[in-house]
Amino acid sequence: MLHSETIRPTPRPTPRHRFRLPLRQLPAMDLPFLVLVLTLVGFGLVMLASASSAVALYRRGDAWAYLRPQLLYAALGLVGLWLASRVDYHIFHKLAWPLLALSLVLLVAVLFMPEYNGCKRWLVRPGLGTLQPSEIAKFAVVLVFSHVISINHDQMKRFSVGVLPFALVLGVVAALMLLEPHLSGTLLILGIGAVLMFVGGTGLKWFVLAGVSGVAAIGAAVVIMPDLVPYAADRLNSWLDPFADPLGDGHQTIQSLYAIGSGGAAGLGLGNSRQKHLFVPEPQNDFIFSIVCEELGFVGACAVVGLFVLLLWRGITLAAHAPDRFGALLVVGFTVQVALQAVLNMAVVTNTIPNTGISLPFFSSGGTSLMMLLGEMGVVLSVSRGET
């Protein structure tokens, strides 16, 4: 006897879904600002490839020894930019003080590191290169100032709220950086802090008082500087008359001015710099702008300046349309930091101010600086999305 088998219906195939990363749908970031950042990164890498080739070949036997790690840092930095642009920037309310505490610990730790060119600015990480704590300190100062101002904006005219906490933070950070010594970084952080305090509503009388005190402090420092800070005194003397010591402290400035003068209107052409062949001691770092002027001329120099001006202008525009005060202050802090650092670097290269050792954002060799910079630009893009 045959038993009929129960016929089961053929199951329908389950629909196949494409794998997607669990990311939120966010408003679009500001495209003009992103394009400016990417243009500066690309321009900087091209100029670093040219400016560093000779010194890299001489020092390390590899013409791309400075470019290769910078490409890696740029890639990591762009990933950081993308991630930061997708993070709700309000999280930095909670991270501001812990990051400042971390930066202070690192600024103390760096004082126990070996000297390089008369300074102690880098923490050596075996197998991972170096870390510059001042870059983290700049980031932390912007976060802390933006956080404090945004929650106390209606009391910023009072000394105990609008001056004292900021003066304490700047005083501690500046003192630690001066011990390295890192004069340019100190000036930069003081400048960033002053701008944020002014934008945040600190009373004008306190700025006048600070200005008078600053002039008095500088006057006193000029008198006692040779005994107190020989490093700064040497830089000041070489600025006033670099040709007094053409083979010593004035050598870098003189060779930089030669490079700028050689460029003329249109430059010698990309890759054709003569001064990068061991005449300018640090063509891949603080003095890369002189190589830009030599190879690309006045036109190329104006293009670099124009990009930084546009970045600042776009940042101010984004700050004006930010969803809240905290976001606006973050954008102002980070874009002013880039612009002010670029101005200080170009002023040093052209001998307008003493050589204080400050890099050109997006152009100079340096992994910590580039990655932190791109992370900061990511925060600006996060604010530009307009989410409250």
Give short role names for the model-derived ranges:
Residues W97-P98, L104, S160-L178, L183-I224:
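Hydrophobic alpha-helical segments of polytopic membrane proteins
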Residues V79, V87, V144, G219, ...:
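Transmembrane alpha-helix boundary/anchor motif
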Residues I149, L187-W206, R274-G300, S359-L374:
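Interfacial segments of multi-pass membrane proteins
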Residues Y116-W122, G127-T130, L209-A303, A322-L330:
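Hydrophobic, glycine- and aromatic-enriched re-entrant/interface helices and adjoining loop segments
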